[in-house]
Structure formats: C-alpha cells, structure tokens
Amino acid sequence: MSLKLPEHVAIIMDGNGRWARQRGLPRVAGHYRGAEVAEDIIEYCIELGIKHLTLFAFSTENWNRPKEEVKALFELMENYIRSKREKLYSLGVRVRLIGRRDRLSRGLVNLMEELESDSKDFKNLFLNVAIDYGGRDDILRAVKKIMEVQPSKLDEETFSQFLDLSCSPDPDLLIRTAGEKRISNFLLWNLAYTELYFTDTLWPDFTREEFMKALEDYSRRKRKFGRVLDE
C-alpha cells in the first residue's frame, strides 16, 4: 500500500531542555541540537514531497523562561539564519515568520524579513517558523484586523485570511515530541480537523525514522471531517 502523505505537517518541538539535563549540559545545548534536527527534518520533507512545514520555535508564554535562556534562544535563531540561509535558498525553501513581531529584536525581525523576501519565489517547501506565537493571540490579532469587515461578509474562509497561517492550508498532521499530550496554545483555529500524533521521543533525539513512524500512523487514519465514512 502506498503511503498517504500529509500536505502540511506542524511540529511542536518539545524536550530540548530535558535532553540537555539528562546529559548534564546547559539547556541551550539542547536547543542547538534541536536546531540541527529541525534542519534534517526540513530536508526530509523536501525529499518526501511534503509541501508545508510549520515549526513552533518560541511561544508567547516562553517569555516566562529564565532571561538567560531566552537571550540564548534568540542568539541561536539569529546565528542559525545567518549560517543556514544560503542552504535554505539552495533547497528551494520559502520561509515565513508567523507570530508577533513587535516584541522581537529589530535585528531578528530584519533577518527574518530578508529571508522572507529573498525566498518568496521558492516552492520546494513552504516553511512557517512560529516565533512569539500563541493561538489565542493569533485569533485576537485577526479579530482586530477584521473589525472593519461588514458582519454579513464574515465567514470562516474570510476570517482565516486574517490569521498568521493564511498562506498555508490547515495542517493535516500535528506532531508533538517529548510525551506531552496537549497543543499548548498552538494554531488553535487551524488545528480544528488536524490529526494529532504524540511521541515520547525528545526533539533532539527525533530522527527521520521517528518522523516516518508519524507519517505511517497518519497514513493509516481515515479523516472524517465530521462525516460518516463507510467502514
């Protein structure tokens, strides 16, 4: 039986801190290893023909973490963009930043906007990177933008166009690593009919083989979207 692949995969990359702690390393070491794993999964998605990938890199709640860790995370993001953007271009990856931009450093926003502009014509993979993102905040910002629309013209399709993920279809599959079984305020509107897959594997240990397990599990599911399917 051929594998039925999702068009859009979203991933909550959890477990970096636990991975580092288990090895007696600083938490930031887990984040650096996690970035390497993300890079490999990006390449694997292209090889498989998956067209959309959304990675949850930093939530609106992550500001509550220790200041030194937050600082190190943003330094990692900036360093990663500078060192990897040419590779992303060569792979044909179009990158989009989703989430709030007003609380990010000007340097990081400038880098991300350059990446968005330079990659806008690439089509091998549409990569959405969620930084300072929260599902409730996304919906609230959409409501503020849509208040000028006449109520009679407002429907689900129109509302979706005001959300951060408007340029990608809703995720078909959400993967969360590290054993937690919740969506943690991620893409609340967009996950309405998304298939959920949870694994105990920590994100820094997440391999192509683990990713394929999730895809195989997804392929066996029958998506109903509220309908009754014949058995």
Swiss-Prot record:
Claim: Kinase is one of the keywords in the record: no
Active site residues per record: D14, N62
InterPro entries in the record: UPP_synth-like, UPP_synth-like_CS, UPP_synth-like_sf
Please name one Pfam family that this protein belongs to: Prenyltransf
Q: Name one GO biological process term.
A: polyprenol biosynthetic process
> How is the cofactor bound here?
Binds 2 magnesium ions per subunit.
Q: Which UniProt keywords apply?
A: Magnesium, Metal-binding, Transferase
CDD domains tied to this protein: Cis_IPPS
Coiled coil stretches, renumbered: none
Annotated binding of substrate, by residue: 15-19, 27, 31, 59-61, 63, 65, 176, 182-184
- Kindly list the positions annotated as binding Mg(2+): D14, E195
At the top of the EC hierarchy, this enzyme's class is transferase
* SUPFAM superfamilies reported for this sequence: Undecaprenyl diphosphate synthase
Q: Which cofactor does it need?
A: Mg(2+)
The UniProt record lists the keyword Magnesium: yes
Q: What is its EC number?
A: 2.5.1.-
Name the family: Belongs to the UPP synthase family.
> Per its UniProt record, what PANTHER family does this chain match?
DEHYDRODOLICHYL DIPHOSPHATE SYNTHASE 2, DEHYDRODOLICHYL DIPHOSPHATE SYNTHASE FAMILY MEMBER
Q: How does it assemble?
A: Homodimer.
Q: What functional role does this protein have? A: Catalyzes the condensation of isopentenyl diphosphate (IPP) with allylic pyrophosphates generating different type of terpenoids.
Indicate what this protein is called per its UniProt record. Isoprenyl transferase
What species is this protein from? Answer: Aquifex aeolicus (strain VF5)
Cite the source lineage: Bacteria, Pseudomonadati, Aquificota, Aquificia, Aquificales
